[in-house]
């Protein structure tokens, strides 16, 4: 790391997160260095003056100014469903990513992360990770974690649209309707059901799944949040435990050269794979992680849900190996791809 006076200090990455492209570094120095205070994100207002600090195009430390253009922007960076950002018109160019976005008192408002641009340069639409979430990165780093862990909701939902508000007897487009719940979901455990409308987390309005996940992430794993929701016409509030995604002893396998689909990498289903590939929580089968050459030529793709081999349902690695081993000449594989059931036939 290069300091403002030109000195270089080495450091190590102690925590990182691919989803947000953010990391925590530990500098190899005993010197007490200047630091920024974190601004409470819910106090940031649209129109507020901010400064973006970075090293655009490698020209050196640069400061640009602008305002907060918007709050609660979601699904911006690489189409991330987990993204939740502050929007600014302060010029942000390649090299500014990871730089500080500060207010006029010098407090950290956010960390610059991305821009929307057709040319690759600044068009006045930049985004920053809110300081509240940055603070959780620091907390987890101090706890000894090496990768950032978000609380697991085990729930899917969708924002309330204008067309949905009237039939649901809602006064405005606010909240999100629960469309699916995992059997182990902490929301399900407190009695929240499909069709309920979640309106607040810890008293703060939410309008999308990404906003709810952000509120949960800021609260942190191991805590509780108050979830306010509408159920059967009544407003209720329940305390929900914030937990990690269940980590069962799941099995996976890369098929060997003696089997008919060498290099095919399949795994039993987990909540992580269901979330990553957008599969319903009720899905059954094996997830394809890598096709290998032969299965790829047959038409399999990474992310396919392998459900039947030669007409036999498969949910475990043992069932898959047994079904594959029983194939003598002609065979078939049934997969689910983006909700479509597809049968692939082959001959040995």
What do these predicted ranges mean?
Residues 2, 12-14, 31-59, 93, ...:
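Active-site substrate-binding loop(s) of clan PA
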Residues 1-4, 15-19, 53-57, 73-74, ...:
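Beta-strand-rich soluble domains of envelope-associated proteins
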Residues 33, 53-66, 72-98, 103-141, ...:
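Active-site loop architecture of trypsin-fold serine endopeptidases
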Residues 18-21, 339-340:
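Short acidic/glycine-enriched loop/turn segments that link adjacent beta-strands
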Residues 36-39, 86-102, 181-187, 291-298:
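Gly/Ser-rich catalytic serine loop of serine hydrolases
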Residues 21-27, 88:
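A generic structural motif
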Residues 8-13, 26-27, 45-48, 108, ...:
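C-terminal recognition in membrane/secretory proteostasis and scaffolding
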Residues 3, 8, 63, 103, ...:
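Short, acidic, Ser/Thr-enriched surface-loop or helix-capping motifs
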